[in-house]
């Protein structure tokens, strides 16, 4: 069976979730949309580090953001898929 786009998407998603900080960010975003400063306080890591993790999640198609003035607020693009993945890990 050849590798197709669906396999690549799933692998990319799992790879992006395979870091404790990113996993915590995703769990917090399951609760509600969060702005960058809120996320930084919740996970207690530096601003540049948070930005790097959020970019990884965004480029993997897991999160997206909306601009509120000077703030970037992040949300999960497909929370149902994330819930399924996290449930499978229990």
Residue ranges and their predicted role:
Residues 20, 30-37:
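Short capping segments at the starts of secondary-structure elements
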Residues 40-41, 52, 58-59:
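Alpha-helical residues within the helix-turn-helix
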Residues 9, 73-90:
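Conserved segment of winged-helix/HTH DNA-binding domains
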Residues 35, 46-49:
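Helix-turn-helix DNA-binding motif, specifically the short coil turn and the N-cap/start of the second
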């Amino acid at each position: 069976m050849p590798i197709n786009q669906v396999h690549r998407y799933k692998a990319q998603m799992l790879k992006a979730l395979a870091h404790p900080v990113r996993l915590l960010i995703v769990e917090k975003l399951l609760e509600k949309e969060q702005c960058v400063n809120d996320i930084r306080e919740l996970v207690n890591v530096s601003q540049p580090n948070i930005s790097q993790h959020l970019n990884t999640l965004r480029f993997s198609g897991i999160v997206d953001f909306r601009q509120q003035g000077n703030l970037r607020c992040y949300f999960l693009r497909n929370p149902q898929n994330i819930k399924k993945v996290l449930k499978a890990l229990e």
